[in-house]
Regions:
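Flexible loop/hinge segments that line or gate small-molecule binding clefts
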Residues: 152-158
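Short secondary-structure boundary segments
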Residues: 43, 123-124, 249-251, 280-281
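A short acidic, glycine-rich active-site loop
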Residues: 63-78
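Redox-cofactor binding/interface segments in oxidoreductases and associated redox assembly factors
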Residues: 13, 121-122, 165, 248
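Short, flexible loop segments at boundaries between secondary-structure elements
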Residues: 273-281
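Small/aliphatic-rich secondary-structure junction motif
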Residues: 2-64, 145, 158-226, 243
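Structural beta-alpha unit
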Residues: 2-7, 46, 82-119, 217-246, ...
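Hydrophobic alpha-helical segments and helix pairs
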Residues: 95-152
């Protein structure tokens, strides 16, 4: 059976119903310009949205203490849902709203991701709801519960001019690169940078294979060695090369993972608001 290449992607947008994310909608709007999408909004109560972020952010198991007295403004929730559907209509985007959950919210969202191509979350909400002490643990555990790839989008999202692909030779990093390539063919003409950590080896793992894989989708690609004692080099590259998107696998506790946590997540992703695409298998 041959799959029709012009299929409609199903995109999940998980958001706190009391806050509308301009960045998330801009991302979906840009996707729809390249290929039709079905935007499925999952409107969660504030308390459930915070729990979703904590759980998908990989916070250690245990009780989450959230103010039970959070006031939910039903009028504001309805206004934001109406705003979302109206904007979708104005931009020719097929959309649905799911806000009637019969299961525990995390089980429901995980089930939704099983039948979706991509989950989109506002990185602004993510960082506002995670304390400083938990942000450094983000990459190792990010969104392991999702059954589809995930992208964290900043509020000032712009279509990237450059794609950075984090590579450590692991199957997870290769899987993330492949998933990104499948989902975003419109980015194949962008400048791509394969980044790996120089641990004293003469070459990167499986060089011929990874070059063949990337060159087939991203003809304008180059390789960047990130030296162990030069993490700031990567930050400087991000700052000096315009709008950038980072592609990463769900790394284990490798050296690359430790470097990403300390340099990318806390400094680059937070302060410079770079969108990050994460996929795991």
């Amino acid at each position: 059976m041959i799959c029709n290449i012009l299929f409609m992607k199903k995109i999940l947008l998980a958001f706190d119903g009391q806050h509308f994310s301009k960045g998330v909608f801009e991302f979906v709007k840009q996707m729809n310009k390249h290929q039709s999408v079905l935007a499925t909004g999952i409107s969660l109560p504030a308390v459930d949205y915070v729990e979703l972020l904590y759980s998908y952010g990989g916070i250690p198991a245990g009780p989450i203490y959230i103010n039970d007295a959070i006031n939910v403004d039903d009028r504001l929730v309805k206004e934001n849902i109406d705003r979302f559907t109206e904007l979708c209509k104005q931009n020719g985007i097929a959309c649905k709203i799911h806000n009637d959950f019969t299961k525990h919210v995390l089980s429901q969202v995980r089930e939704e991701t099983l039948f979706a191509d991509l989950l989109v979350i506002s990185s602004k909400s993510f960082y506002e709801n995670l304390g400083e002490e938990t942000q450094d643990d983000y990459v190792d555990n990010v969104l392991h519960k999702s059954e589809c790839p995930v992208i964290l989008v900043p509020e000032d999202y712009k279509e990237p001019a450059n794609i950075i692909m984090a590579y450590d030779g692991s199957s997870q990093s290769v899987f993330a690169i492949k998933q990104f390539s499948y989902l975003f063919p419109e980015f194949h003409d962008k400048q791509a940078l394969l980044v790996y950590i120089d641990k004293g080896k003469s070459d990167l793992p499986e060089r011929a294979n990874i070059e063949e894989l990337i060159s087939g989708c991203f003809p304008r690609f180059s390789i960047f060695k990130l030296k162990i004692d030069a993490r700031k080099d990567m930050e400087q590259w991000l700052i000096s090369n315009g709008d950038t998107l980072l592609v990463a696998g769900a790394f284990g506790r490798s050296l690359f993972s430790e470097m990403l946590k300390k340099s990318f997540i806390k400094d680059v992703l937070h302060h410079h608001k770079v969108p990050i695409f994460v996929a795991h298998k």
